[in-house]
Amino acid sequence: MTIEEEVLKRIKPSKEDEEKLRERAQIILDRLKGYNAEIEGSFRKGTWLKGDTDIDIFVFFPKSVGKEYLREKALKELIERFRDLNYKIAYAEHPYLIVYVDDVEIDVVPALSIESGEEAITAADRTPFHTKYVISHLDEKGRDEVRLLKRFLKGIGVYGAEIKVKGFSGYVTELLIIYYGSFKEVLRNASKFRPPVRIELVRPKKEFDSPLIVPDPVDPKRNASSAVSLKSLATFALASKIYLEKPSMEFFFPSKPGRQTIKGDILLVKVKIEESTVEDIIWGQVWRNVEKLKTLISHEGYRVIDISAWGDAENITIGIQLESKSIGEYYLNVGPYFYLHNVKNFIEENENVWIGEDGRLYSIKRRRYTVEEIIKRNLSFKQKFTYELQWLTEEVDDPWINLFLRKTPSWLK
């Protein structure tokens, strides 16, 4: 049995798995009698993975009611159908419901009924056209190839178009298989990717500026892969190259890292978001904080080895790895050459000024802030939040911290 056959055996749902989800979905559909409601997403397309226990049901309203109706009245109407069930309100471009039936999570999403993908007013409006396109272009073998590619992307950490991941959506994964024909062919081509990569199932109707460009076949004005970052594309390309040379289950099911040696000084910024907010909104702010802190800490003279973040919409950890947290209290401040117009300002603003052998002015300056002070002054979220700082002083069992310390993905070596 090949690795791909073994993986497929583990990830392909059985008839019993499918029937279980279909029965739960029918409970919701029965509650939506009178509405134009349909199952969408990977379950409908037959590309879902064993263990996935969520289903998308879209409820389509006339286009004439507009986006504001979806945000306000549509949600209230839908809630009336599920008051006696366990549900919660979630948020994307507009609110939707997550209804729990036993252990199955069912997203009930209001959308507008349109004639073509190009008429979409909200992102959800295109979904049925995505579903129809994929179903019409994939047979049973093609659906299995999608499953393999999904599991591969999950294993190397680049599956998901959300801001937290900045990776490949399920739809883009399906389009890659439709374009190249098989899992192995996708990897063979991905191993040669050089950005910008263009994969055109349809001629685009506008120019795109992204590492990966996949015009949406149902709306060619849209780049379906706009979420994919350069890092995610690079990870996919390198993982594809290495897998083709030396296949391993580690690409699909990576082993958890053991305890790692602490190299340098590690500061953990543990953030607690006190308000319920859309995960994409939180993670947009997380990555902006990461970039800002890296810049400010480096500017203060600390050498940053690495900085990253992990967590969810409520609990986030920002890991900062420094060569050393102990650096001099004073530092050399390099000024302008003696003949430049801002020499006078430099002299007035600094003490201990001298002229160097190179004709530049120099001074000695006291460092203004420690790393902790930089974080205290600059960490920010629009939502109410609290945080605590922890210097890592001993090895721990936390898999995310150990992954941050190890750096190297298990499939890379």
From Swiss-Prot:
<feature type="binding site">
    <location>
        <position position="150"/>
    </location>
    <ligand>
        <name>ATP</name>
    </ligand>
</feature>
<comment type="function">
    <text>Catalyzes the addition and repair of the essential 3'-terminal CCA sequence in tRNAs without using a nucleic acid template. Adds these three nucleotides in the order of C, C, and A to the tRNA nucleotide-73, using CTP and ATP as substrates and producing inorganic pyrophosphate. tRNA 3'-terminal CCA addition is required both for tRNA processing and repair. Also involved in tRNA surveillance by mediating tandem CCA addition to generate a CCACCA at the 3' terminus of unstable tRNAs. While stable tRNAs receive only 3'-terminal CCA, unstable tRNAs are marked with CCACCA and rapidly degraded.</text>
</comment>
<dbReference type="InterPro" id="IPR042090">
    <property type="entry name" value="CCA_tRNA_nucleotrans_2"/>
</dbReference>
<comment type="subunit">
    <text>Homodimer.</text>
</comment>
<feature type="binding site">
    <location>
        <position position="45"/>
    </location>
    <ligand>
        <name>ATP</name>
    </ligand>
</feature>
<dbReference type="GO" id="GO:0042245">
    <property type="term" value="P:RNA repair"/>
</dbReference>
<dbReference type="GO" id="GO:0005524">
    <property type="term" value="F:ATP binding"/>
</dbReference>
<keyword id="KW-0819">tRNA processing</keyword>
<feature type="binding site">
    <location>
        <position position="159"/>
    </location>
    <ligand>
        <name>ATP</name>
    </ligand>
</feature>
<feature type="binding site">
    <location>
        <position position="150"/>
    </location>
    <ligand>
        <name>CTP</name>
    </ligand>
</feature>
<dbReference type="InterPro" id="IPR043519">
    <property type="entry name" value="NT_sf"/>
</dbReference>
<dbReference type="Pfam" id="PF09249">
    <property type="entry name" value="tRNA_NucTransf2"/>
</dbReference>
<feature type="binding site">
    <location>
        <position position="107"/>
    </location>
    <ligand>
        <name>Mg(2+)</name>
    </ligand>
</feature>
<comment type="similarity">
    <text>Belongs to the tRNA nucleotidyltransferase/poly(A) polymerase family. Archaeal CCA-adding enzyme subfamily.</text>
</comment>
<feature type="binding site">
    <location>
        <position position="130"/>
    </location>
    <ligand>
        <name>ATP</name>
    </ligand>
</feature>
<dbReference type="InterPro" id="IPR006116">
    <property type="entry name" value="NT_2-5OAS_ClassI-CCAase"/>
</dbReference>
<keyword id="KW-0460">Magnesium</keyword>
<feature type="binding site">
    <location>
        <position position="54"/>
    </location>
    <ligand>
        <name>Mg(2+)</name>
    </ligand>
</feature>
<dbReference type="InterPro" id="IPR011068">
    <property type="entry name" value="NuclTrfase_I-like_C"/>
</dbReference>
<dbReference type="GO" id="GO:0000049">
    <property type="term" value="F:tRNA binding"/>
</dbReference>
<dbReference type="GO" id="GO:0001680">
    <property type="term" value="P:tRNA 3'-terminal CCA addition"/>
</dbReference>
<dbReference type="InterPro" id="IPR002934">
    <property type="entry name" value="Polymerase_NTP_transf_dom"/>
</dbReference>
<keyword id="KW-0694">RNA-binding</keyword>
<feature type="binding site">
    <location>
        <position position="42"/>
    </location>
    <ligand>
        <name>ATP</name>
    </ligand>
</feature>
<dbReference type="InterPro" id="IPR015329">
    <property type="entry name" value="tRNA_NucTransf2"/>
</dbReference>
<feature type="binding site">
    <location>
        <position position="130"/>
    </location>
    <ligand>
        <name>CTP</name>
    </ligand>
</feature>
<keyword id="KW-0692">RNA repair</keyword>
<feature type="binding site">
    <location>
        <position position="159"/>
    </location>
    <ligand>
        <name>CTP</name>
    </ligand>
</feature>
<keyword id="KW-0479">Metal-binding</keyword>
<dbReference type="Pfam" id="PF21133">
    <property type="entry name" value="CAA_C"/>
</dbReference>
<keyword id="KW-0547">Nucleotide-binding</keyword>
<keyword id="KW-0067">ATP-binding</keyword>
<dbReference type="GO" id="GO:0000287">
    <property type="term" value="F:magnesium ion binding"/>
</dbReference>
<dbReference type="InterPro" id="IPR048833">
    <property type="entry name" value="CAA_C"/>
</dbReference>
<feature type="binding site">
    <location>
        <position position="42"/>
    </location>
    <ligand>
        <name>CTP</name>
    </ligand>
</feature>
<keyword id="KW-0808">Transferase</keyword>
<feature type="binding site">
    <location>
        <position position="56"/>
    </location>
    <ligand>
        <name>Mg(2+)</name>
    </ligand>
</feature>
<dbReference type="GO" id="GO:0004810">
    <property type="term" value="F:CCA tRNA nucleotidyltransferase activity"/>
</dbReference>
<feature type="binding site">
    <location>
        <position position="45"/>
    </location>
    <ligand>
        <name>CTP</name>
    </ligand>
</feature>
<dbReference type="Pfam" id="PF01909">
    <property type="entry name" value="NTP_transf_2"/>
</dbReference>
<keyword id="KW-0548">Nucleotidyltransferase</keyword>
<dbReference type="InterPro" id="IPR008229">
    <property type="entry name" value="CCA-adding_arc"/>
</dbReference>
